[in-house]
Amino acid sequence: MLAWAGGDLHAFESLYARHRKRLFGFLLRQLRDNALAEEIFQDVWQRVISARAGWQPDAAFSTWLFRIAHNRLNDHWRAARHRPAAPADADLRLAALEDGHTPEAELSEFEQRRRIQRAMEDLPPEQREVLQLRLEQELSLEEIGQITGVGRETVKSRLRYAMDKLRAGLNA
């Protein structure tokens, strides 16, 4: 980020390539709408570009990037006042980003992902968000706290409650 802030365009290309798939996957899972996820994805990167000159390395770039995404999601939900239903093919769209699966394996994985998705949809938004940031983005508790604006213990509590509810939902 420092190299790009200093004017190195190749550094931006490297940052974008390194973080685009994780960021888009996070947004798609939160929004459950491909077109809206793409729109907010572009908006997040536009905000990164706009803020490049004033960026301070207080945290890792990925933490800063996901904090921007978190704030942008909150703006969207505040404006929309609702969460749209998940499109039926959201998992397939995300799976299309990956290669190498047989049709049988994809069907089995799809069924398993669908069960997990249903259980995750039943989680409160705060618990679902911290669970996705921890499991999918592999962020630390401190990074999740910075992104969501809550303390480490609150993050731990939300993760624990989310896992308990997820287990109960999958075992039902």
Predicted regions: what they are:
Residues 83-109:
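Internal acidic/polar
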Residues 1-22, 29, 104, 121, ...:
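N-terminal module of bacterial RNA polymerase sigma factors
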Residues 16-20, 24, 34-51, 139:
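Conserved RNAP core-binding helix
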Residues 50-57, 67-88, 109:
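Arg/Lys-rich amphipathic alpha helix in sigma70-family domain 2
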Residues 118-129, 133, 137-154:
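Helix-turn-helix DNA-binding module
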Residues 25, 39-46, 59-71:
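Structural recognition of an alpha-helix C-terminal capping motif at a helix-to-coil junction
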Residues 24-27, 78-81, 123, 128, ...:
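Short, Lys/Arg-enriched C-terminal cap helix and immediately downstream tail that follows
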Residues 5-6, 29-32, 43-60, 79-81:
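Sigma70-family region 2
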